[in-house]
Amino acid sequence: MQHGDFDNAIIILNRALQVDKNNLDMQKDLAMSYYYKRDYARALDQAKILLDRDDADAVCYQIGGNVYKALEEVKDCERVYKAGLKKFPNNGPLLSEYGELLWEKKDFSSIDQWEKGIRVDPGYSGNYYNAARFYFFTKDKVWSLIYGEIFVNMESLSDRAAAMKQLLLDGYKQKLFADANITAGQEKSKSEFSKAFLDCMGKQSSLLSRGVTTETLTMIRSRFILEWFDKYAGRFPYKLFDYQRQLLQEGIFNAYNQWLFGTVENLAAYDTWTKAHDEEYKNFIAFQKTRVFKMPTGQYYQDR
């Protein structure tokens, strides 16, 4: 199945299940093989078998939800996700996918699912992705940037990460620094973390005389980290900012910001920069490859 040969996977799994008919992992693989082959009728038959099992795990409910979604059976899809979340209320993938279903229905309580996923299962990337995109289209200036950058670091090689980098650059340009007073429109925020973020960012606005570019963002974000750790880090410990400070201390924060923003602002300029700063760029890539970015529990500050 890993090689995309779903027909052969189905043949092998069907025969294996004749010998071990109650093997949960093989039943899940068979359902997913039919799903990836787009044989949704047979995928549904297998999904129902999974969901009828007393030992059905969270993945079984994901499979069922995905199959019903592919069949555009919205009510059944929602029923499956609700049943899964009743059994596994803190499962990040289920919260993420149920939120996506609500979003497709234009039910904006979807953000409640994604925020809960971030709070109870912070190591799962999908909720950061969905929440960042949600906040980008609201008046909020903070959380699309925070969640978006977390997502890019958790899922750095995916196509979604490339799209999120563009969203981040747009967020700094079109939202955070669009007004001279960056707190404008944020007066109703209940999050003390958000207020602290805006306080530190607002003090760097004088650096924007040349607009928002990768270079100015690097300067702003460098000074932000120094300000944050001077005033707020003790009150709001946060892995993302710990990581940024570590990059500063290692002398590769400039390369990180080029990787984060330069690739979408101007790819040719980014290539020129990497050649001119070959050692720093290679040090950053080597550093990045040796670490898995993961948010810990207990660092949730989105008071809505």
Where are these regions (language model features)?
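Register position in tetratricopeptide repeats
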Residues: Q2-H3, Y36-K37, A70-L71, W103-K105, ...
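TPR alpha-solenoid repeat register
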Residues: M26, C60, L94, N127, ...
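Canonical tetratricopeptide repeat
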Residues: D29-M32, Q62-I63, E97, N130, ...
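Eukaryotic alpha-helical solenoid repeat scaffolds
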Residues: G123-R304
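Canonical positions in the second alpha-helix
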Residues: R15-A16, I49-L50, A83-G84, K116-G117, ...
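Single-residue signature of alpha-solenoid repeat helices
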Residues: A9, A43, C77, S110-I111, ...
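TPR-repeat structural position
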Residues: F6, Y40, V74, D107-F108, ...
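Short coil turns that delineate tetratricopeptide repeat
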Residues: K21, D55, P89, P122, ...
